Amino acid sequence: MPYSYTEKKRIRKSFAKREDVQNVPFLLATQLQSYLTFLQADTATSDRVNEGLQAAFSSIFPIVSHNGMARLEFVSYALGEPVFDVKECQQRGLTYASPLRAKVRLVLLDREVSKPTIKEVKEQEVYMGEIPLMTGTGSFVINGTERVIVSQLHRSPGVFFEHDRGKTHSSGKLLFSARVIPYRGSWLDFEFDPKDVLFFRVDRRRKMPVTILLKAIGMTPESILAHFFDFDNFELKSEGGMMEFVAERWKGEMARFDIADRDGKVIVEKDKRINAKHLRDLAAGGIQRVSVPEDFLYGRVLAKNIVDPDTGEVVAHANDEITESVLNAMRAANVRDIQTLYTNDLDRGPYISQTLRADETADQMAARVAIYRMMRPGEPPTEEAVEALFQRLFYSEETYDLSRVGRMKVNSRLGRGDDSTGPMTLTNEDILETIKVLVELRNGRGQIDDIDHLGNRRVRCVGELAENQFRAGLVRVERAVKERLGQAETENLMPHDLINSKPISAAIKEFFGSSQLSQFMDQTNPLSEITHKRRVSALGPGGLTRERAGFEVRDVHPTHYGRVCPIETPEGPNIGLINSMALYARLNEYGFLETPYRKIIDGKVSDQIDYLSAIEESHYVIAQANAALDDEGRFVDDLVACREAGETMLTAPGNVHYMDVAPSQIVSVAASLIPFLEHDDANRALMGANMQRQAVPCLRPEKPLVGTGVERTVAVDSGTTVQALRGGVVDHVDADRVVIRVNDEENVAGEVGVDIYNLIKYTRSNQNTNINQRPIVARGDKVAKGDVLADGASTDLGELALGQNMLIAFMPWNGYNFEDSILISERVVADDRYTSIHIEELTVVARDTKLGPEEITRDISNLAETQLNRLDDSGIVYIGAEVSADDVLVGKVTPKGETQLTPEEKLLRAIFGEKASDVKDTSLRVPSGMTGTVIDVQVFTREGIVRDKRAQSIIDDELRRYRQDLNDQLRIVENDQFDRIEKMLVGKTVNGGPRKLAKGATLTKAYLADLDRWQWFDIRLADEQHAVVLEQAKESLEQKRHQFDLAFEEKRKKLTQGDELPPGVLKMIKVYLAVKRRLQPGDKMAGRHGNKGVVSRITPVEDMPHMADGTPADIVLNPLGVPSRMNVGQVLEVHLGWAAKGVGYRIADMLRDERTAQAKSVRGYLEKVYNTTGSSAHIDSLTDEEVLELANNLKKGVPFATPVFDGATEEEIGKMLELAYPDDVAARMRLTASRSQAWLYDGRTGEQFERPVTIGYMHYLKLHHLVDDKMHARSTGPYSLVTQQPLGGKAQFGGQRFGEMEVWALEAYGASYTLQEMLTVKSDDITGRTKVYENIVKGDHVIDAGMPESFNVLVKEIRSLALDMDLERN
């Protein structure tokens, strides 16, 4: 395959043993696809499917008035264009959203006519609120901040059977239960109690016998028994009776009387157990009926009502037990044939019969009344109310919705096939079948469901969550509309008078703004963004809660394979509740996770890929991706390791149906970025995956030497890089933008053949890290669609680069790497390897107060000129100013309340005029502990308020930039068009033209070059056809100019109109500070294998351990961090990184030769490196120039890819090390025979250490836990109101709590005065602490401790318990 523009600049050598059958799918597809389906904005109204907004509207409309005379129908909806784009919304603190307008129709019926006829119809578009739009990268901009809606994993609608595992009853008996869960509506539960009576409950209310529900749906006791039992038939005799003989019902029973065949020969004696031989003998004897004694009938249960044939009187009821008196009554009434229920102790329990006995309701109405009383206790049951309630419970589409998923799950669980046909409400059959399956379970047949199986849990995505909220808003609107529809006719109302969009806006706003699933996007680096969008949470509304979630829900389940990552989940209370989607997983139409497999046809692995959900997968045998195949795609081994229904086993190749797509299929994005993951302990891999998300982007990103090959996918899919939308030639590049002239074949007619990519420069992310894009193309480069044009934060040549490659030595060093501490060389800090830029946003608002407006100004009293010298005339700081804590950024004064003046002051006022002290200084200052450079200032002014100079200049700059974009587009379009015109004109005959061009003359290039290009249109061509083309060209150019002018005007209008600010705010100013954070002791760092630590010391280069050739180590880690933690992957990474660097050094040596030899020798060496082991690279497809450019990029090390579970083996690493360090080099550097260790020397003494040390390169990250953000000190500051003790925490500028144990320590030392000082004047003795302050100012260091405020609080608490407590003062 051909390499892309960036790939061929730096080819990653892969150690994968097998080619990828399928590329990693687009990583944000789930989010984008889901929201697209929800909006269906670009779909024509007629083609819209019933999903998302369309489904919400059509489920609520039409709305009919109470009297049925007016109805409001939904026609269609349309989404408008958003007013501001994403960037503008972020700057102005707005929501990126589109206005939603629905076309509705009001139909009024004529009251006068007997049959309904339409009197009038009014149609109108009604505004329905704003719907937030998703950005191209799957996030939302809500109130100026980027947020992500996390998908929710919830229990699928359907019917589920389970038991209590013997925990409810002390006997340990299993109590079975069933539950019907709809998508919305009442839950229906069925459960057995310890006495084997079956109950049902609605919405977890009081339980009632299940036969009440069966009677309520119209069944009689007879039909209930007929549905759940088989019958035994008896013919009554004057003494005893004859019983129909059914052989299988007798097996294993104890004979209660002698059983004889037709000839009277006894086959089974009394009190003997009947076995299979007896039954065979009886069958051979041809027995149809058996004579049974009288007492055999006692205790049996009648299946039907027994009626006296003569009088019609009921002698005995169905479900009555037969006693002597009942038998006599039946004989007296001349009843011959009776039917009883067939039950036994083993697998035919009498449960429904027992339940029927416990149920006292007489008929259907009584049953429904009982249900009504349970649902609405205390309300009088009228017949209509009872009927309505029962219908609304399970049968009304308004209140009950199983959804397609629910219907499919119910059908498949009740054995009706896997389709979703059938009503979306419950049916009587569903209820009956469910009870039947539950009774069968109690009888010991069938299996309970596993609720943690991914076939029983489904994912709700953004679109579905938003749709539910939208529907909730519409329901509120519906209520209001119903009320008003009655007046529609009389008051001549229009649809927009009926519909108020507030409830919809409120529901949407609440969901996007404050739902548990709408989260502040984690934007530390590209990986954290992408992982956040692929997250699947079991928490949230309608999900689990942390406290209730047990161990099983959190655990890894066999069905997670290929769907949910078994590694990546947070540590702490949320473990296992928040998961990440696996690399290849996607959602099917029902919302279940599915994963791809390669189909095996006739024992041969094909390239056909099928996606299987957890339910479908259980029917197949699936081989793993690393199973050995021959060239034809058949399995090599006689036994293949496979999975079937969650179990692992070995089986013959002929039995296998599918095979995994890739070894990395089971892990998530973050876990798939860990090289040698297969050698790490699971707990550490979890930490590694989580900590990569906290890596701070470095100033100069550096690609990992040892990667896994997924880095490019992540960088591109996350949207941090800039990708070419269309192929073409780079026309212009600077730091801010890339301009591309599009290839003709990719350009749509009538469109501008220019793509301009404005790059994001020094922008603040949600986590205050810096987002900055840098172009990586040069003018004249040819790029194809999808090529990377610019790197973003943490990307290097289009690959994810979270950290830096560091030379690491595993050895102890003077205790500075005790307990995971990290020793770092000063050179790392000097080279700015881990320096990162953090951007802080500081905001100040000028409000309109009661005493007058606040003012942004440079004119502030009581401030020295030196404090104001960074401000411009408007009182706003200059861009580029370096500021530190407490410097003024924006001058602001607030009017102060009038104070009562003394007569003297009044006199002075009268003489000297107004004094300027009636304002106080409330300027924006730099917070404590922060220094940085001002990189941007934004000024927002309310409509109708005059802009200051600064605001105007910002707008002018913005317009100038926009104009330049338009001019560039125009220039390229015009050049392109004029080139074509020139080709057409040269050599043509003319009728005349400018500069006295004679008729019949032929046009030349020189003549055209002499003219101004716009004068070419004045040439009159002889050929009519060409003249028309020339005229059209002129028109299209003028049209383009006009379009661009319009675009510019629109932009200017947008910028010059006032800004929308919160009420009472006149002006808002945002100042952005760039803070440079260098690496320092106390910063947290980590590798990718969960090997984290804190920088303990930064040591001078000359003191670091160094190699024989003088190369000092960058980082010294403790070797004791490896064995107990079992993350051996880091050691392998170090070895392979060492090889990667060595190969780079060898290439650098070759490049020192003269040019002609270079390409040849380098090509040979690269062939060796890339094609000795693992998958091969196509070096031969590159030209000599490209090979040399590649070699230049590889001088600092050849990047390797060792994919997860398919990576480099020890032998391969050994081979690479030999290629990298030939014998002469190894000897010079004093490496050991394996090349993986070296003899090091102590930098301080120059002595050799006493044994060789493992040394090599590891990709090491700096995490977002920086000591600068945590370090904090307080002198004086705010106090808590009630206790008067200092607040806690850095954010409140609080103090350090001198806690209980610290007090014990001072008590133990007997330091009583220190202790007194700590508990009084340094804490909450109010008078004491003010006194101390005064004393210190006077230079008199005496303390006088008084009563701590907390004691007064205690006294008050005791008084609140009605105990009076007074102090005796002496």
UniProtKB/Swiss-Prot annotation:
Catalyzed chemical reaction(s): RNA(n) + a ribonucleoside 5'-triphosphate = RNA(n+1) + diphosphate
Biological processes annotated in GO: DNA-templated transcription
Coiled coil: none
Swiss-Prot/TrEMBL keywords: DNA-directed RNA polymerase, Nucleotidyltransferase, Transcription, Transferase
Broadest EC class assigned to this enzyme: transferase
Entry keyword Repressor: no
UniProt entry tagged with the keyword Nucleotidyltransferase: yes
Entries under InterPro entries matching the protein: DNA-dir_RNA_pol_bsu_ext_1_sf (IPR042107), DNA-dir_RNA_pol_bsu_external_1 (IPR019462), DNA-dir_RNA_pol_su2 (IPR015712), DNA-dir_RNAP_su2_dom (IPR007120), DNA-dir_RNAP_su2_hyb_sf (IPR037033), RNA_pol_bsu_bac (IPR010243), RNA_pol_bsu_CS (IPR007121), RNA_pol_bsu_protrusion (IPR007644)
Assigned GO CC terms: DNA-directed RNA polymerase complex
Matches recorded under CDD domains: RNA_pol_B_RPB2 (cd00653)
Alphabetical list of SUPFAM superfamilies matching this protein: beta and beta-prime subunits of DNA dependent RNA-polymerase (SSF64484)
UniProt EC number: 2.7.7.6
GO molecular function: DNA binding; DNA-directed RNA polymerase activity; ribonucleoside binding
Source species, domain of life: Bacteria
Similarity annotation: Belongs to the RNA polymerase beta chain family.
Role, per record: DNA-dependent RNA polymerase catalyzes the transcription of DNA into RNA using the four ribonucleoside triphosphates as substrates.
NCBIfam families in alphabetical order: PRK00405.1, rpoB
Subunit: The RNAP catalytic core consists of 2 alpha, 1 beta, 1 beta' and 1 omega subunit. When a sigma factor is associated with the core the holoenzyme is formed, which can initiate transcription.
The name this protein goes by in its record: DNA-directed RNA polymerase subunit beta
Organism the protein comes from: Bordetella pertussis (strain Tohama I / ATCC BAA-589 / NCTC 13251)
